[in-house]
Protein backbone atom coordinates (compact mmCIF):
# COMPACT_ATOMS: atom_id res chain seq x y z
CA UNK A 1 0.00 0.00 0.00
CA UNK A 2 0.96 3.62 -0.49
CA UNK A 3 0.45 5.39 2.86
CA UNK A 4 0.98 9.07 3.67
CA UNK A 5 1.40 10.03 7.33
CA UNK A 6 0.66 13.62 8.40
CA UNK A 7 2.05 14.73 11.76
CA UNK A 8 3.29 17.74 13.70
CA UNK A 9 5.99 15.64 15.40
CA UNK A 10 8.24 12.79 14.32
CA UNK A 11 11.66 11.35 15.04
CA UNK A 12 14.11 12.61 16.25
CA UNK A 13 11.62 14.54 18.42
CA UNK A 14 11.39 12.95 21.86
CA UNK A 15 7.76 12.43 22.86
CA UNK A 16 5.20 9.66 22.83
CA UNK A 17 3.65 10.59 19.48
CA UNK A 18 7.01 10.75 17.68
CA UNK A 19 8.10 7.47 19.27
CA UNK A 20 4.87 5.69 18.34
CA UNK A 21 4.91 6.97 14.77
CA UNK A 22 8.56 6.05 14.30
CA UNK A 23 7.78 2.46 15.28
CA UNK A 24 4.61 2.39 13.17
CA UNK A 25 6.29 3.75 10.05
CA UNK A 26 9.30 1.48 10.51
CA UNK A 27 7.09 -1.58 10.91
CA UNK A 28 4.98 -0.74 7.86
CA UNK A 29 8.08 -0.21 5.72
CA UNK A 30 9.53 -3.52 6.88
CA UNK A 31 6.35 -5.15 5.60
CA UNK A 32 6.82 -3.63 2.17
CA UNK A 33 4.45 -0.66 2.35
CA UNK A 34 5.44 2.67 0.78
CA UNK A 35 5.16 5.20 3.60
CA UNK A 36 5.76 8.93 3.21
CA UNK A 37 5.81 11.21 6.27
CA UNK A 38 4.68 14.83 5.93
CA UNK A 39 5.87 16.52 9.10
CA UNK A 40 5.73 20.00 10.57
CA UNK A 41 9.05 21.82 10.52
CA UNK A 42 10.44 25.34 10.72
CA UNK A 43 12.76 24.60 7.83
CA UNK A 44 11.96 23.84 4.19
CA UNK A 45 12.72 20.74 2.18
CA UNK A 46 13.07 17.13 3.24
CA UNK A 47 14.65 15.50 6.29
CA UNK A 48 15.30 12.00 4.95
CA UNK A 49 14.07 10.06 1.94
CA UNK A 50 10.40 9.47 2.55
CA UNK A 51 9.88 12.66 4.59
CA UNK A 52 8.69 16.14 3.61
CA UNK A 53 8.92 19.24 5.80
CA UNK A 54 5.67 21.21 6.08
CA UNK A 55 5.19 24.83 7.24
CA UNK A 56 4.80 25.32 10.99
CA UNK A 57 5.15 27.73 13.89
CA UNK A 58 6.43 27.07 17.42
CA UNK A 59 3.82 27.00 20.17
CA UNK A 60 4.18 30.37 21.97
CA UNK A 61 4.25 28.93 25.49
CA UNK A 62 6.32 25.87 24.53
CA UNK A 63 8.80 26.56 21.73
CA UNK A 64 9.92 22.94 21.42
CA UNK A 65 6.43 22.06 20.13
CA UNK A 66 5.69 22.82 16.47
CA UNK A 67 2.17 23.47 15.17
CA UNK A 68 1.62 22.62 11.51
CA UNK A 69 -0.03 25.32 9.42
CA UNK A 70 -2.95 24.79 6.99
CA UNK A 71 -1.56 23.15 3.85
CA UNK A 72 -4.57 21.84 1.92
CA UNK A 73 -3.21 23.02 -1.45
CA UNK A 74 0.10 21.23 -0.92
CA UNK A 75 -1.66 18.05 0.14
CA UNK A 76 -3.99 18.12 -2.87
CA UNK A 77 -1.09 18.76 -5.24
CA UNK A 78 0.86 15.81 -3.88
CA UNK A 79 -2.07 13.43 -3.73
CA UNK A 80 -3.27 14.26 -7.23
CA UNK A 81 0.23 13.38 -8.47
CA UNK A 82 0.91 10.43 -6.15
CA UNK A 83 -2.44 9.23 -4.89
CA UNK A 84 -2.07 7.28 -1.62
CA UNK A 85 -4.23 4.30 -0.74
CA UNK A 86 -4.81 5.83 2.69
CA UNK A 87 -3.80 8.92 4.67
CA UNK A 88 -3.02 8.62 8.38
CA UNK A 89 -3.38 11.92 10.27
CA UNK A 90 -1.71 11.74 13.69
CA UNK A 91 -2.20 15.29 15.01
CA UNK A 92 -5.19 17.62 15.09
CA UNK A 93 -3.39 20.88 14.26
CA UNK A 94 -4.50 23.20 11.43
CA UNK A 95 -2.20 21.13 9.20
CA UNK A 96 -3.88 17.91 10.27
CA UNK A 97 -7.35 19.37 9.75
CA UNK A 98 -6.38 20.59 6.28
CA UNK A 99 -5.05 17.12 5.43
CA UNK A 100 -8.41 15.57 6.37
CA UNK A 101 -10.20 18.15 4.21
CA UNK A 102 -7.90 17.60 1.22
CA UNK A 103 -8.16 13.82 1.43
CA UNK A 104 -11.95 13.92 1.64
CA UNK A 105 -12.09 16.27 -1.36
CA UNK A 106 -10.07 13.74 -3.38
CA UNK A 107 -11.99 10.79 -1.89
CA UNK A 108 -8.83 9.33 -0.38
CA UNK A 109 -9.55 7.19 2.73
CA UNK A 110 -8.50 8.91 5.97
CA UNK A 111 -7.59 7.30 9.29
CA UNK A 112 -6.83 9.48 12.30
CA UNK A 113 -4.94 8.58 15.44
CA UNK A 114 -5.96 9.86 18.87
CA UNK A 115 -2.56 10.20 20.50
CA UNK A 116 -3.00 13.12 22.91
CA UNK A 117 -5.71 14.35 25.28
CA UNK A 118 -5.18 17.98 24.28
CA UNK A 119 -8.51 19.01 25.76
CA UNK A 120 -7.29 17.91 29.20
CA UNK A 121 -4.25 20.17 28.88
CA UNK A 122 -6.50 23.24 29.08
CA UNK A 123 -6.63 23.32 32.88
CA UNK A 124 -2.87 22.84 33.18
CA UNK A 125 -2.29 25.97 31.09
CA UNK A 126 -5.07 28.03 32.70
CA UNK A 127 -7.55 27.69 29.83
CA UNK A 128 -10.18 25.57 31.62
CA UNK A 129 -13.03 27.44 29.97
CA UNK A 130 -11.83 26.21 26.58
CA UNK A 131 -11.95 22.50 27.43
CA UNK A 132 -15.48 21.99 26.09
CA UNK A 133 -14.62 23.87 22.89
CA UNK A 134 -11.50 21.71 22.49
CA UNK A 135 -13.54 18.50 22.87
CA UNK A 136 -16.04 19.75 20.28
CA UNK A 137 -13.24 20.57 17.83
CA UNK A 138 -11.56 17.19 18.28
CA UNK A 139 -14.84 15.27 17.96
CA UNK A 140 -15.87 17.10 14.80
CA UNK A 141 -12.48 16.57 13.17
CA UNK A 142 -12.14 12.90 14.10
CA UNK A 143 -15.69 12.12 13.03
CA UNK A 144 -14.82 13.34 9.53
CA UNK A 145 -12.29 10.50 9.24
CA UNK A 146 -13.23 7.01 8.14
CA UNK A 147 -11.76 5.65 11.38
CA UNK A 148 -9.97 6.85 14.50
CA UNK A 149 -7.50 4.46 16.12
CA UNK A 150 -6.87 4.63 19.86
CA UNK A 151 -4.25 2.84 21.99
CA UNK A 152 -6.48 1.12 24.56
CA UNK A 153 -10.00 -0.18 25.11
CA UNK A 154 -10.40 2.28 27.98
CA UNK A 155 -9.57 5.15 25.64
CA UNK A 156 -12.11 3.84 23.13
CA UNK A 157 -14.86 3.80 25.76
CA UNK A 158 -13.94 7.30 26.97
CA UNK A 159 -14.07 8.82 23.49
CA UNK A 160 -17.22 6.92 22.61
CA UNK A 161 -18.84 8.52 25.65
CA UNK A 162 -17.82 11.93 24.26
CA UNK A 163 -19.51 11.24 20.93
CA UNK A 164 -16.53 10.09 18.86
CA UNK A 165 -17.48 7.59 16.15
CA UNK A 166 -15.84 4.69 14.28
CA UNK A 167 -13.20 3.96 16.91
CA UNK A 168 -10.78 1.04 16.73
CA UNK A 169 -8.04 -0.08 19.12
CA UNK A 170 -4.46 -0.23 17.83
CA UNK A 171 -2.38 -1.39 20.78
CA UNK A 172 1.22 -0.67 21.70
CA UNK A 173 4.14 -2.83 22.70
CA UNK A 174 7.36 -2.63 24.72
CA UNK A 175 10.79 -3.64 23.43
CA UNK A 176 11.58 -6.26 26.06
CA UNK A 177 15.08 -6.78 24.65
CA UNK A 178 15.97 -3.11 25.11
CA UNK A 179 14.16 -2.56 28.42
CA UNK A 180 15.65 -5.46 30.36
CA UNK A 181 16.35 -5.61 34.13
CA UNK A 182 19.74 -7.10 33.23
CA UNK A 183 20.84 -3.58 32.24
CA UNK A 184 20.88 -2.54 35.91
CA UNK A 185 24.16 -0.69 36.44
CA UNK A 186 25.66 -0.26 39.92
CA UNK A 187 28.09 2.39 38.67
CA UNK A 188 25.20 4.49 37.36
CA UNK A 189 23.48 4.30 40.74
CA UNK A 190 26.74 5.33 42.41
CA UNK A 191 26.96 8.36 40.11
CA UNK A 192 23.59 9.42 41.52
CA UNK A 193 25.04 9.24 45.04
CA UNK A 194 23.05 6.11 45.90
CA UNK A 195 24.23 3.79 48.66
CA UNK A 196 23.87 0.06 48.11
CA UNK A 197 20.58 -0.43 49.99
CA UNK A 198 18.92 2.87 49.13
CA UNK A 199 15.67 2.87 47.17
CA UNK A 200 15.71 4.87 43.93
CA UNK A 201 12.44 6.50 42.92
CA UNK A 202 12.28 7.63 39.31
CA UNK A 203 10.28 9.96 37.08
CA UNK A 204 10.72 9.70 33.31
CA UNK A 205 9.17 11.96 30.68
CA UNK A 206 8.68 15.47 29.40
CA UNK A 207 9.02 18.01 32.19
CA UNK A 208 5.82 19.93 31.55
CA UNK A 209 2.75 20.93 33.56
CA UNK A 210 0.42 18.32 32.07
CA UNK A 211 2.63 15.52 33.46
CA UNK A 212 1.66 16.35 37.08
CA UNK A 213 5.30 16.19 38.14
CA UNK A 214 4.90 18.24 41.31
CA UNK A 215 2.57 15.53 42.63
CA UNK A 216 5.09 12.78 41.86
CA UNK A 217 8.06 14.58 43.40
CA UNK A 218 5.89 15.79 46.26
CA UNK A 219 5.06 12.18 47.11
CA UNK A 220 8.77 11.41 47.32
CA UNK A 221 9.30 14.39 49.66
CA UNK A 222 6.45 13.16 51.85
CA UNK A 223 7.97 9.67 52.03
CA UNK A 224 11.28 11.20 53.08
CA UNK A 225 9.56 12.98 55.97
CA UNK A 226 7.53 9.96 57.08
CA UNK A 227 10.40 7.47 56.83
CA UNK A 228 13.55 9.46 57.68
CA UNK A 229 15.57 6.33 58.47
CA UNK A 230 14.95 4.73 55.08
CA UNK A 231 17.56 5.65 52.49
CA UNK A 232 16.03 6.88 49.26
CA UNK A 233 16.89 8.96 46.23
CA UNK A 234 14.80 10.73 43.57
CA UNK A 235 15.97 10.60 39.94
CA UNK A 236 14.34 12.62 37.16
CA UNK A 237 14.98 11.65 33.53
CA UNK A 238 13.78 14.05 30.84
CA UNK A 239 13.74 17.69 29.83
CA UNK A 240 11.18 20.39 29.26
CA UNK A 241 9.94 23.83 30.30
CA UNK A 242 9.63 22.91 33.99
CA UNK A 243 13.26 21.83 34.40
CA UNK A 244 14.47 24.96 36.19
CA UNK A 245 11.46 25.31 38.49
CA UNK A 246 11.64 21.63 39.49
CA UNK A 247 15.36 21.93 40.22
CA UNK A 248 14.61 24.86 42.53
CA UNK A 249 11.68 23.20 44.28
CA UNK A 250 13.33 19.78 44.68
CA UNK A 251 17.09 20.44 45.08
CA UNK A 252 17.77 16.95 46.48
CA UNK A 253 16.61 15.22 43.30
CA UNK A 254 19.07 14.09 40.63
CA UNK A 255 18.19 15.52 37.20
CA UNK A 256 19.67 13.45 34.37
CA UNK A 257 18.30 15.31 31.35
CA UNK A 258 17.04 13.63 28.20
CA UNK A 259 18.14 10.05 27.53
CA UNK A 260 17.62 7.76 24.56
CA UNK A 261 17.94 4.13 23.53
CA UNK A 262 20.22 1.90 25.59
CA UNK A 263 21.18 4.81 27.84
CA UNK A 264 17.49 5.33 28.71
CA UNK A 265 17.09 1.60 29.30
CA UNK A 266 20.02 1.67 31.75
CA UNK A 267 18.37 4.49 33.67
CA UNK A 268 15.09 2.61 33.92
CA UNK A 269 16.84 -0.57 35.07
CA UNK A 270 18.76 1.32 37.76
CA UNK A 271 15.52 2.52 39.40
CA UNK A 272 13.53 0.63 42.00
CA UNK A 273 10.19 2.47 41.87
CA UNK A 274 8.77 4.42 38.91
CA UNK A 275 6.42 7.29 39.79
CA UNK A 276 4.00 8.23 37.00
CA UNK A 277 1.45 10.83 38.06
CA UNK A 278 0.20 12.17 34.72
CA UNK A 279 -3.59 12.24 34.41
CA UNK A 280 -3.68 13.21 30.72
CA UNK A 281 -2.14 10.18 29.01
CA UNK A 282 -3.72 8.17 26.22
CA UNK A 283 -0.88 5.66 26.53
CA UNK A 284 2.23 6.36 28.60
CA UNK A 285 5.16 5.52 26.33
Question: What are these regions, as identified by a protein language model?
Answer:
Residues 1-55:
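N-terminal subdomain of nucleotide-sugar transferases
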Residues 21, 28, 201, 216-220, ...:
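A structural motif in glycosyltransferase catalytic domains
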Residues 39, 53, 131, 135-185, ...:
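Donor nucleotide-sugar binding/catalytic pocket of nucleotide-sugar-dependent glycosyltransferases
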Residues 75-96, 100, 106-111:
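Short N-terminal targeting/anchoring amphipathic segment
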Residues 104, 114, 118-147:
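A conserved, positively charged/aromatic
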Residues 194-222:
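Conserved donor-binding/catalytic core segment of Leloir-type glycosyltransferases
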Residues 227, 243-263, 273:
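Nucleotide-activated donor-binding/catalytic signature segment of Leloir-type glycosyltransferases, i.e.
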Residues 279:
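Aromatic "clamp/platform" in nucleotide-sugar-dependent glycosyltransferases that forms part
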Amino acid sequence: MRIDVVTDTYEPDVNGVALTLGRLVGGLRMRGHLVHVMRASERNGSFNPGETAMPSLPLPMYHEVKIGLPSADRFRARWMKKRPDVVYVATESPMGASAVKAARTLEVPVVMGFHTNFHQYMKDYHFSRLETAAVNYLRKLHNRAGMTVVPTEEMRRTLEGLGFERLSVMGRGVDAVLFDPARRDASLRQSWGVWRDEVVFGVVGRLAREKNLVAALGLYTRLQREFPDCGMKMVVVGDGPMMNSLRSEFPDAVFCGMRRGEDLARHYAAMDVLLFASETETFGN
